Amino acid sequence: MSQASSSPGEGPSSEAAAISEAEAASGS
């Protein structure tokens, strides 16, 4: 798990971006 946490693509920023994208797609 620590490896995924260390990965830049698996960081909280990526999660927030994914949530934003999901919300935008849902609102479309």
UniProtKB/Swiss-Prot annotation:
<feature type="region of interest" description="Disordered">
    <location>
        <begin position="1"/>
        <end position="28"/>
    </location>
</feature>
<keyword id="KW-0010">Activator</keyword>
<keyword id="KW-0920">Virion tegument</keyword>
<keyword id="KW-0597">Phosphoprotein</keyword>
<keyword id="KW-0945">Host-virus interaction</keyword>
<comment type="similarity">
    <text>Belongs to the herpesviridae pp71 family.</text>
</comment>
<dbReference type="GO" id="GO:0019033">
    <property type="term" value="C:viral tegument"/>
</dbReference>
<keyword id="KW-1048">Host nucleus</keyword>
<dbReference type="GO" id="GO:0042025">
    <property type="term" value="C:host cell nucleus"/>
</dbReference>
<comment type="function">
    <text>Stimulates viral immediate-early (IE) transcription. Counteracts the DAXX-mediated repression of viral transcription. Displaces a DAXX-binding protein, ATRX, from nuclear domain 10 sites (ND10) shortly after infection.</text>
</comment>
<keyword id="KW-0946">Virion</keyword>
<protein>
    <recommendedName>
        <fullName>71 kDa phosphoprotein</fullName>
    </recommendedName>
</protein>
<comment type="subunit">
    <text>Interacts with the host protein DAXX; this interaction takes place at ND10 and induces the reversal of DAXX-mediated repression of viral transcription.</text>
</comment>
